Each structure stands twice: as structure tokens, then as C-alpha cells.
């Protein structure tokens, strides 16, 4: 079992990388790479939990929309930032 401090640190790293990406002109390809990375991490630290299911819902809503990659990334980051304090 992975301890909560490790989960918190890993999730914070995902968020930080997403925030760094937002400082650039985010392309769809860049967003997709970050999304796969973030999804993989969430699966490892929260597989089958409410956090994981909630993130999958956010991902589905971004895929079903025609918003810009920057906005998609923002939606994902908003969710991850929201659950970060709950992980610790």
C-alpha cells in the first residue's frame, strides 16, 4: 500500500508539470501527452476510488467538448488541485 505522503507528492508533481505546461502555448498533442501521464498517475495512486472516477468524468467532459487545449488542461488541473488536500 502506498502511503498518503507519497501519493500527495506524486499528485503535486503532476499538478506542477501541468502548471508549467500552461505557461506555454498548449497544443492538443501536448495536452494529450500530459493527460495520459496524469491519468496513469491517478490510476496508480487512486485506482477505483471516488477520486479516480471523478477524474475520468472530467477527462470525458474535456474530450466531448470543442474547447481549446489550454482550457482542457485547466479543467483537469482544477479537479486535481481540488483533491490534493484530500489525499494528504
How should these model regions be labeled?
Residues 1-88:
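Charged interaction/catalytic cores of defense and host-pathogen modules
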Amino acid at each position: 500500500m502506498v502511503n498518503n505522503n507519497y501519493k500527495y507528492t506524486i499528485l503535486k508533481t503532476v499538478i506542477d508539470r501541468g502548471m508549467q505546461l500552461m505557461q506555454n502555448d498548449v497544443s492538443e498533442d501536448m495536452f494529450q501527452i500530459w493527460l495520459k501521464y496524469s491519468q496513469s498517475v491517478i490510476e496508480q495512486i487512486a485506482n477505483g476510488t471516488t477520486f479516480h472516477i471523478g477524474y475520468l468524468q472530467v477527462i470525458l467532459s474535456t474530450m466531448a467538448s470543442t474547447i481549446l487545449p489550454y482550457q482542457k488542461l485547466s479543467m483537469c488541473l482544477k479537479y486535481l488541485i481540488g483533491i490534493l488536500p484530500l489525499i494528504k
